[in-house]
Amino acid sequence: MSPRPDIARQRPDILCIGSVLWDVIGRAPRRMALGHDVPGRITRLPGGVAMNIAAACLREGMRPALLTVLGRDSEGRALADACAAMGLNTDHVTWADDLPTDRYMAIEAENGLVAAVADAHSLEAAGDRILAPLSDGALARADRPWTGRVALDGNLTLALLEQIAASPLFATADLRVAPASPGKAGRLLPLLGHARATIYVNRVEAGLICETLFDSAEAAARELVDRGARRVLVTDGSAPVAEAAADGAFHVARPPTVSVCRVTGAGDTFMASHIAAEARGEQGAAALEEALAATALYVSSA
């Protein structure tokens, strides 16, 4: 679905809070291992967990707004222009004179992600400054909190996620939460038991949160619910995806078989597509199937 050009001027129906940065991705059409130096293609495009979720929501016809920080530098201005050209709402971005625009660098090959480094230090340094639109009246305020959907990404600091978990500003929001990477999965612990949170993780991230090795998404999803999660969705690459909830609901779906051309942003696309499917009224296995189909299309397109 192509985004309408006026969509950024409409009131948002989902807030994407977290990293918006430049993705620098090197891709090689062969298998790679540590130390390999091979020919390929290097691209730069807008990225970051919050950005990827917003872009996928936009493709699904939703109206996302970005809450993040950008440096008031040439890279930040170019990134904001690129987001606006896509149709994303950047009205509530925090601009920083003292911080550079964040970046992410990854190497992908035929055998998947080889290595990646995320430099999200400016987002971490900005802290709760990026949440100002939720209390100053721009989007909401303390006596009229945001009641819509919110996508939170694990690039936010543990302290800020703890603050969000306890904040009345988010008490009535539909929270959707994803770690930025396995290394940051532990940051989601403050939100694990939140009464309005849905957690999206992969099998490895679930294992790090639970300090357990899981052999399937199904086992990981059940354990996360046993540990207090209200609802959780666990992916596992090409293996089945599982959804479990504290009310006993449990669903499993298998991803379509496709040739994988890219992996960066796949988890974010799954999360956004699932949110969009539920916004359209789909539930349970039907919403999972729609999200998996959208993700398969994403990873199989260059």
Task: Give, region by region, the residue ranges found by the protein language model.
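Conserved phosphate/ATP/ADP-binding segment of small-molecule kinases
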Residues: 165, 169-250
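Gly/Ala-rich phosphate-binding loop of Rossmann-like dinucleotide-binding domains
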Residues: 58, 169, 279
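Glycine-rich phosphate/adenosyl-contacting loop at the front of the ribokinase-like
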Residues: 1-69, 74-88, 253, 259-260, ...
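Conserved N-terminal subdomain of the carbohydrate kinase-like
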Residues: 22, 34-36, 44, 59-148
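Conserved phosphate-binding/catalytic region of the ribokinase-like
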Residues: 2-14, 38, 185, 217-302
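Short beta->alpha connector loops
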Residues: 72-73, 155-159, 179-184
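Short, conserved phosphate/pyrophosphate- and ester-handling motifs at nucleotide-, phospho-/glycolipid
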Residues: 57, 202, 267
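Structural motif
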Residues: 13-15, 148-149, 174, 198
